[in-house]
Amino acid sequence: MLERLLTISLEQRLLILLGALALAGAGIWAWSELKIEAYPDVADTEVAVIVKYPGRPAEEVEQQITIPIERALNAVPRVLTRRSRTIFGLAVIRLTFEEGTDDYFARQQVLEKLRDVDLPEGAELDLGPLSTPVGEIYRYVVEGDGYSLVQLRELQDWVIIPALLQVPGIADITNFGGVEKQYNVIVNPAALEKYGLTIEDVEKAIQANNSSTGGNILSMGSSQLAIRSVGRIRSIEDLQYTVLKSEGGTPVFLRDVASVELGALMPSGVLGYLDKTRGKESNDGVEGIVLMRRGENPSQVLQGVKAKIAYLNSRVLPNGVRIVGVYDRTDLVESTLATVGKTLFE
């Protein structure tokens, strides 16, 4: 049998050579498509419900947010465990499902039950990203010569994160550091009393004037004009000229009872990092953590992330601003493969 096989191989050299090349090509393709991880992902299917209720104590958050959501989620099928945590201004409810449960099925069931929950005004509900505890594959910082933390945070929120979320396989980008811009309204109590106003009146007036509304179509001959009201606040001047009330036909503006200045939202923490490769240490900055969607190929996702970052650095971000990687899962994967290969060889 072996002699006949050798004879056929010698007689059909071209066919055998082509077959060997095809087999080698298939092997190379299979290797490139192989999902190589530093450690296996053995996490159960889990859905996290995250509700922000700013400024509320833990007891109030638990009564108005956590307990109603827990009751609604009791009817979700195939759930193994339910855990919740309530802190100041935040509630997190985690559901762990039976082994083999499809991720999208689990999230759909949770969303259907959440529709029946009546949350108080001001509460923001969201589902956690479709990732796992080992889904963190890349970290970067945003640096800019001559740019403030407010400006870097704006670039992160409005340019960098939306662009990176377009990369296939990305579940979410977690934002750390920076300072969020806000308008500070410093009210003069004596002026409020003079015009017969309260803090609630000022708050309602600002909310009512910070919106745009749609109108209708006005026909003018063969043309049509779209009518709309543009009221979105875009600058300090827009805010200063917000009308609070009218006395005898004379408007009372916000600037008459308060001063308006550009400020920053009080941060809940500070980001610091040490880049040993460049010998740079920073006590503040803006960082992004890239989370991979469950079941994706980390090598391919990382290639897409790096390509997008290179594009942003060269074509999109202003001069002096750059995205610098500080953690890359590729290094860990290569180190793990080298260790495994060395062990097998020995």
Where are these regions (language model features)?
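Membrane-proximal extracytoplasmic
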Residues: 1-345
